């Protein structure tokens, strides 16, 4: 704990007696959708199928290609394609679609995902992280994207763990990039709800958030202060010109709060 931030670390010894040796286990069928280079020098992003039956794997491969191309079309990934590999893993489910508790619909799927996380209809996650990693056995993997075979809007991004998003909703492309920003980059949400301030306790206004793209101005110098033009006021007023030009500034509203977070 440095006073400004805290970090937790846990050392894993590969020789630990309680770690099962799975080097002889066969890897699931998989395909490189984008190969930037050698696995030892690249970040390997594995894309898993969730809620796709064996007969729907071809559809999954098409969806995974869409996700890969969309992510790599945005900076900073666009300029660093040679540092990433994207690998689609054919992980079939017994049932098609995913579990929807609010409809009392429970399905047997590869990682057991479900909507209604934290009782939010759109929040789609899975607590079966062990299942995800079992599916990647003997496949290079530093990060996970899970595509859900449903047209219902939803998803979630868990920092340093996985992105999970629905593949057949019209907003699939922007949502998979958004959730990847959470899971891979640790970015906070840059939006808020007009009706109410949700999750008021999620961010203390007396401290600087750990997410790199939101601030309470407590320690803004540690964030993107060096990217703001000296002629731009802080906080920054929203204008049509700034919106059109994507002017870097400090705009109020973020982390689900309309006031106090920028």
Put a short name on every predicted segment.
Residues 83-160:
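Active-site-proximal segments of metallohydrolase catalytic domains
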Residues 180-196:
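Catalytic Zn2+-binding segment of zinc metalloproteases
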Residues 2-32:
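Short beta-strand elements
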Residues 37-41, 78-81, 136-141, 158, ...:
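Extracellular/periplasmic catalytic domains that process cell-envelope and extracellular macromolecules
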Residues 22-73, 88-98:
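Fold-level signature of zinc-dependent metallopeptidase catalytic domains
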Residues 51-54, 92-96, 150-154, 170-172, ...:
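Solvent-exposed loop/turn segments at secondary-structure junctions
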């Amino acid at each position: 704990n440095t006073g400004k931030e805290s970090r937790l670390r846990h050392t894993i010894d590969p020789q630990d007696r309680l770690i099962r040796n799975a080097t002889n286990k066969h890897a699931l069928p998989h395909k490189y959708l984008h190969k930037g280079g050698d696995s030892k020098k690249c970040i390997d992003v594995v894309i898993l199928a969730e809620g796709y039956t064996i007969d729907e794997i071809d559809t999954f491969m098409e969806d995974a290609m869409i996700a890969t191309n969309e992510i790599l079309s945005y900076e900073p990934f666009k300029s660093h394609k040679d540092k990433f590999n994207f690998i689609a893993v054919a992980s079939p489910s017994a049932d098609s679609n995913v579990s929807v508790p609010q409809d009392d619909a429970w399905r047997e799927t590869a990682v057991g995902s479900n909507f209604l996380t934290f009782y939010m209809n759109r929040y789609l996650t899975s607590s079966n992280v062990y299942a995800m990693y079992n599916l990647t056995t003997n496949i290079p993997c530093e990060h996970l994207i899970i595509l859900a075979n449903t047209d219902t809007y939803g998803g979630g991004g868990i920092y340093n763990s996985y992105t999970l998003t629905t593949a057949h909703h019209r907003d699939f492309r922007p949502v998979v990039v958004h959730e990847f920003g959470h899971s891979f980059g640790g970015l906070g949400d840059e939006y808020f709800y007009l009706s109410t301030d949700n999750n008021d306790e999620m961010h203390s206004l007396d401290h600087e958030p750990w997410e790199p793209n939101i601030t309470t101005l407590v320690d803004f110098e540690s964030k993107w202060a060096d990217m703001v033009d000296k002629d731009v006021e802080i906080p920054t007023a929203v204008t049509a010109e700034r919106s059109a030009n994507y002017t870097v500034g400090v705009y109020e509203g973020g982390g689900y709060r309309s006031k106090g977070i920028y």
